[in-house]
Amino acid sequence: MPRHSSTMSRLVLPLIFSILLVSKPSPSQAQDESLAGSFLSGLLDTITSTADSKDCPGVCVHTLATLICYEVLDDVACPSPSMKCCIENAPAGKNATAVRATTTPKTTTTASTTTTQRTTTTVATTSTTKRTTTTSTTPKPKPKPQTKRPATSSTTKATVATTKKPSTTKKVATAKPKDKEEATKADDANKDCTGVCVADRIAEYCEAYLTSDGLCKEGTKCCVSLDEYSNGKLPKDIYIPAKHMSNLKPNQTLSEKSAPAKSSSTSTTSTTTTTSTTTTPEPARINNSSPKPTKHKKHPTTTTTEAAEEEEEQETEEDGEEEEPPLSNKLKSGQGQGQVLKECEGECMNGIFAIFCDDIDSDAFCPGEESCCVTGGASEATPSSKAPPTKPAIKHAPKPAAKPARPASPPPAPPSSTSGGGGGGDFLSQIISFAESTLNSPSPPPPPPQAPIQVPRCPGFCLLNIMAAFCERPSVLVSTPTTCAKGSVCCDNSRAGAPKPKLPPPTPSPTASPTAPPYVLPNTPSPDPREECPGSCIVSLLSFTCFKNAEMTDLFRCKRSGQICCAPKSKILEKQQFQTRNDTAYYPAPPPPPIGPPQAYPPQTPPYSYMNNPPPQGPPPQMAPHHPNPYQPPPPAPNYADYYPVSGPGLPPQPQPPMTTPPTTTTTTTTPRPHVYSKYVCGVKGTLRTGRSQALSFVSYARAKYGVQRTARQMTSAAGYSPNFNKSNERLVLGSAIVPIQIHNDKLGDLVESSSLQSNQLRSYHNHQAQADQPDLVYPEYYQQRSLYGLQSNFSGRRRARVVGGEDGENGEWCWQVALINSLNQYLCGAALIGTQWVLTAAHCVTNIVRSGDAIYVRVGDYDLTRKYGSPGAQTLRVATTYIHHNHNSQTLDNDIALLKLHGQAELRDGVCLVCLPARGVSHAAGKRCTVTGYGYMGEAGPIPLRVREAEIPIVSDTECIRKVNAVTEKIFILPASSFCAGGEEGHDACQGDGGGPLVCQDDGFYELAGLVSWGFGCGRQDVPGVYVKTSSFIGWINQIISVNNL
């Protein structure tokens, strides 16, 4: 009882004193010092107080003091509710399940058969057991050194029976118990746990723990400190968690058996408690390389004797020995069999973190699935053969576990030995230990280690298998065995050749073409005269990431092969114009005869013939007007005379050339460079594209490149607009509010039956008035108040007017312009071509015709609808499906947009191209000038030329638009969120017949479809802007329809 109190006081008092030091009162708290002192004094007395209880086998202590108890019995009642029954030491044997405190005899047997009388004591009762130890003289292949807690003494030559008192610890002695210090450790080995018994789940946090049974009760482990073994070798049954492996001293080793082996190979033990042990002959041991026999033991039922315990300990050791070889995280000592693993000289790392290592030592020990990461100048290791380690290896004892299947492996041939008399067993074990240590000791590398030279060294660098994809060209993966560790692969980068020179070559290759694929070769890079990519270089697989104002092009070079430049469109346009200005004049010797496909501008991609039967063409046009050239093109063919009614396609008298001509213009060549833009590039005018016919390219070339301005024509007197007008509620819908206009009767061709009524009654609109073709159900009733008398005019004069004011567009310039016509070959509305199978227009243009079930046709690539044969490349296609926006309001014209899917695909050729769609939600700044095109009226009263014209108008902010429109109407005008305003300049505006047509804004040199003509109050009135559909508000709706149809 006093011992319990002193123990608790020894542990708790330092804690209390530390609390006192921390909570030492300041001078301002002097008045509370006595209170604190009395409180702590009472707390100390309470914690250190103990009490006895008849039911408690130990002593009742305070709950806080149970931390030092070996076991706490919660079901035992104590005098105070705050107390628990505490058992300080391990109970000394409770029936068969109690932990046994055994008596360990020190016995040395001789070659003769002897009978030793032993006194064996158990904890519960002391009984005498007579044990007969039979020692056979059969020689063993290799006597296995054993370390048993009953350590033997080598000084005894006679049969000695010694009874030791029960010890509290079992400590393994060293392998050479000759001096007095070794004998003292052998005595300490008979004690129980020298550390602290902790639960199994906490044992992994110990610096080390012993795995032998009997040290602690079931479910606990003996947790010890490595400092206890700082001057000696580690016992066999010690287990060191991986995180504490670094705490080992270099001179500490873990031996399998530290005591000399007994010379007895077979022992049969008989006890009075019917404990029987049978011996299995040595030849029957197939799966165990240990020379010990496998013992099958029937446990006693009631009492446990010393002999039974000793056998159990021996079998436990055998179990551990059988478990050791399959474990991958074990370090074998020089005295054992199996693979020799060295200690990791770097750091053990797990999983993907191993990729950051300079090298991975596969022969070094790391726990679990971790790898030994060697950084810096660590020596390279060959996985096939390793030299013996320079310091003793460390054996990592395994945890007790079920016996796994052990593969049969023949042990190394030991020297044959026989049992000698007296200390022969000890002498034999010493010889074996010396021989094994000699074999495993460091020595100069003999000639056989020359074998690793056969494994070729990795010519590049080693990568983990999961990182093999990062071995990129021109590096290659080496499939043959190399010096790379297991789980790694060699990436050979020696074949990459010298790095690519950064300096430009002095003499460019004359055969280099700027439009060819990249020229980077593995070893001998060809000179590339192209400029560096001003954008980003990406692989073609990621070309979809190059969008909006950027485009994939071969005009610029990339540093790495297989990549293409994604450059801004403005840079591409500048480069293209620069190349065009550097083209020299094309001087044909005689004017060539009429030719088929155009040859003046060969496309960058494989050439396409856009005109199967082209009309006769004049000589090739003058390519560079800034070069003096007496050659003048002759008058064009009659088919193109109507496009240039004044003076043909000739230029005005020699405009002033720009003075920024590069020096290279002095060279001449007969092969002009092609334009960069192919037919698939959106937002590029038809005058800047490849494959454009020579006759159409002449005027547009000079206008687009050298600033030759067109003559603008203002609204004629027919539009008679006076700014002094009264407010009204009129609203002009710029599409369905016009009468369908008859166009030439060959536009539909074979799309309608020749015997049908509409085909037989087609009439030229030159001799008829609009009223003759006006249906009754075309417009809402409140729109019919406007008199469309402008259609009575005669169009034989071919006045160039369309949108109010503006100017003529060139033939094929606005190549995304589309005309909607009905089955009677009558023009309805404008539209824009956004895909080879998709057309975007205003919803009010098609709602009535869709209700009637009539067919709709589109005309693409036709500059002049009044001509009999149309423009080169023009096509007519039938609309297969009409998608009107689900929220379209025909009264307020909100969401006035429709998507038309064509039956078949439009061929992108001369005069036919696509317009770019804007990004979702993009709005253009107020004041930005954009271009509206269409076939419609020249003024509010007409006439309509049905020829593509353009007008440049400014974007108007929403607030200004609402203010200006409300100033001319009696009704309150509310601008829908999906619409915007543009225009408001007198004489320049869209008008009737332009509905659904495109309003395009230039962004980085490319045109985006900013809006569709919807409606407005009059045409070309000052400060009265028109309303347009905001295309960017419907990008999601458009993409959804197109993606569903493309499935």
Swiss-Prot record:
Protein's name in the database: Protein masquerade
Span list, region Peptidase S1: 803-1043
Gene: mas
Top-level lineage group: Eukaryota
Family statement drawn from the similarity comment of this UniProt entry: Belongs to the peptidase S1 family. CLIP subfamily.
Chain spans, region Disordered: 98-189, 252-335, 376-428, 498-527, 583-673
Annotated spans, CLIP 5: 532-567
Signal peptide feature range: 1-30
Disulfide bond keyword on record: yes
Biased composition (Acidic residues): 307-325
Pfam families the UniProt entry points to: CLIP_SPH_mas, Trypsin
A cellular-component GO term for this protein: axon
Residue numbers spanned by region CLIP 1: 54-87
Gene3D superfamilies: Trypsin-like serine proteases (2.40.10.10)
CLIP 2 as annotated region, ranges: 192-224
Domain notes: The CLIP domain consists of 37-55 residues which are 'knitted' together usually by 3 conserved disulfide bonds forming a clip-like compact structure.
